[in-house]
Amino acid sequence: VRPLVGAEYAALGINDPQGRIERFVTSGMDDETRRRIGPLPEGYGLLGLIIRENRSFRIADINVDPHRHGFPPNHPPMSSFLGVPIAVQGVSLGRLYLTNKLGAAEFSPADQALVETFALHAGIAMDNARLHEQLQRLAVVDERERISKDLHDGIIQNLYAVGLSLED
């Protein structure tokens, strides 16, 4: 989505069931810069605002926004901001964060609409991936249960055969 709206940086924050950021995937930032920044964001400031209010925010300059929490050392400068929640059937899965609109002072309402549509599709894809993962786990459990029953039945048959042999 970063090139679609002309953002210098983008991130996908995936949250755990409690709403905290558990994965933070960045785009537009090289690995060395990402490493120097340090640990994942914890969801304070603007990132936390989107988590708490679960709605989109378009901000012209995050450096003067009252919700700003600040940047860690070695973080690249950022100004314009667009944050959009990702949800499916009312369940929050994560957020898209975009910063530094290229060629304009801030993100437009059209940019926001595009990212919200993208977030809808991303939410469906993320939900499908989670469902697929759950199905794989269930398949493994089913297979283990089948093997367990086969072993159990085989052992019972062997014990019965041994019992018959002993009676003989």
What role is predicted for each listed range?
Residues 3-25, 30-41, 49-52, 59, ...:
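Coiled-coil dimerization/phosphotransfer module
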